[in-house]
Amino acid sequence: MTIKAPALNLPGLGADPLTQRIKEKEKKWKYKVAVLSGKGGVGKSTVAVNLTAALAKMGYFVGILDADIHGPNVAKMLGVEKEEIYAEKFDDGHFEMIPPMADFMGQVTPIKVMSMGMMVPEDQPIIWRGALVTKAIKQLLGDVKWGSLDFMIIDFPPGTGDEILTVVQSIQLDAAIIVTTPQEVALLDTGKAVNMMKKMEVPYIAVVENMSYLICPHCGNKIDIFGEGGGEKLAEKEGVDFLGKIPIDLKAREASDLGIPIVLYGDTPAAKAFMEIAEKLVNKLKEMKGDEKKE
């Protein structure tokens, strides 16, 4: 039976069955990748969304979970924020939400999307304390019909708070991508995020530098607005991989407002950078798990 889903039914399920469902679903996700940042304003969600779209463009089955409960914007960035969410009732009485999908008119393998941004009006704040946030994230993991995925991408809120702990304690991440900018203040907080992932024993940790430089649209020269090389130096210092630099792209704002990932604008520097980063990530994870290259 399929019915329209209400808002998250937080009190309705016991912790044990929900935890079990998460564990069962996790078995169907080949690679689980978190995208996080030590501070806000570095373009973390932009990286998460475009990494997701790049992987789907490569032919992989991808889901993205927006774990930023208080500031969800993944759905809008993928153009599905107005999609209605339906749920299916199971024999034991629990409901599972059916995630909307984005395929951008067949340009990518359909992406499964789940975010609180599809469940509340845009101007309505979500004023929840830690316990409610924890339960919501667990339900987004365990009470959604994710199915089999090559990649589960989880977009964390900035910082090192409850949401991150909840996910890391609920599933076994394969990788953590930490997003920074070249600015010194961003790099300080990025180091904290890297060390948190180390303490959580995430097998593969890498840094991506966003807003690395601007290509002047008039003269074509490269302009290092926020400095140069900070992300790469930090990765070297922390002993983690550096996956690449993403330039400031003047089309990115337009793409984001339209709900189209910039990676689908194939002739742009940012699109090329995202594709290269996605390819590096795939190769690293396959090497780590001993998988053969996808045909």
UniProtKB/Swiss-Prot annotation:
Family: Belongs to the Mrp/NBP35 ATP-binding proteins family.
Subunit structure, as described in the record: Homodimer.
MF annotations from Gene Ontology: 4 iron, 4 sulfur cluster binding; ATP binding; ATP hydrolysis activity; ATP-dependent FeS chaperone activity; metal ion binding
Gene3D superfamilies xrefs: P-loop containing nucleotide triphosphate hydrolases
Keywords for the protein's UniProt record, in alphabetical order: ATP-binding, Hydrolase, Iron, Iron-sulfur, Metal-binding, Nucleotide-binding
Superkingdom of source: Archaea
GO biological process per UniProt: iron-sulfur cluster assembly
InterPro entries: Mrp-like_CS (IPR000808), Mrp/NBP35_ATP-bd (IPR019591), NUBPL-like (IPR044304), P-loop_NTPase (IPR027417), YlxH/NBP35 (IPR033756)
Function of the molecule: Binds and transfers iron-sulfur (Fe-S) clusters to target apoproteins. Can hydrolyze ATP.
Protein name: Iron-sulfur cluster carrier protein
Entry binding sites for ATP: 38-45
